[in-house]
Amino acid sequence: PHALGGPGFVGDDAAPVPGGDLVAACDAIVPSMVERDPEWAGWCSVLVNLNDLAAMGAAPVGLLDALAAPGAAHAARVLDGLARAARAYGVPVLGGHTQLGVPAALSVTALGRAARPVPGGGGRPGHAVRLTADLGGGWRAGYRGRQWDSTTSRRTDELRAMLGAVAAGRPAAAKDVSMAGIAGTLGMLAEAGGCAAVLDVAAVPRPAAASMGDWLTCFPGFAMLTADQPGASAPPAGPAVSAVCGELTTGRGVSLRWPDGEVTEAVGGPVTGLGTA
């Protein structure tokens, strides 16, 4: 169990390090993406780890990367994307490890600081669900309907403002939207809190270029799902758009409430199988 997070943080986006305010996150990029789109893989390795820290309310300190590549040219393309993202976010790459002559693979560890990390499992029935998302940008070329790219066009101050949203708002629970999409990530947040969730489809902030079906299931670049007492203020989040769009309820899974009042099942049960945090 200790490999999955400490008490109260099981399955969380990042792990508080005992004895201080250090928070660590580690994510790997799908190898096929590292192979066919190395610059984007490098950028995303920074993006997803900083999003993980942000979901805990942690301010980033630095990054470590572990890269494997078939050759030096391929490795350079991955590292170029990684370095560009690190500069864009204003977060240093502290070091890492590179191995050549092997299949492509990439993993990044991010370190941050948070005196009081925000858990993913702090939501309870009756809490309002809020989505804070960057609706700028568009579909990444080659990933239409699957990966939305808003971050590569943002300034450093905009990126850092979005990363600070959870720390500023301090909700009861927070999760950054991952490859599971909005629906799947909300399922993770609800599962960690031992409850279910209902999402009001019409209230979900969404870019005009994305269908609702794609938006609820894609990787949206920057998006945070939070749960808190009804009436809690929207956090300052730079260019991101924020709206209450659902609530946590008793039970399990995620339901979608459509504008005509019909309710359909989006997630039938546990997403991770880790249970309550």
Question: Which sequence ranges carry the predicted segments?
Answer:
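Active-site-proximal betaalpha loop/short-helix elements
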Residues: 155-221
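Helix N-cap motif at beta-to-alpha junctions
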Residues: 227-233
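General beta-strand structural signal in soluble alpha/beta enzymes
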Residues: 6-10, 23-25, 92-96, 110, ...
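Short, compositionally biased
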Residues: 139-158
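Glycine-rich anion-binding loops of enzyme active sites
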Residues: 22-23, 29-31, 59-141, 247
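Small-aliphatic-rich amphipathic alpha-helix that forms the alpha element of a beta-alpha
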Residues: 37-63, 77-88, 158-166, 182-188
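Extreme N-terminal cap/leader segments of soluble proteins
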Residues: 1-34, 56, 65, 83-94, ...
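Acidic, Ser/Thr/Pro-rich beta/coil linker or hinge segments at domain junctions
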Residues: 238-277
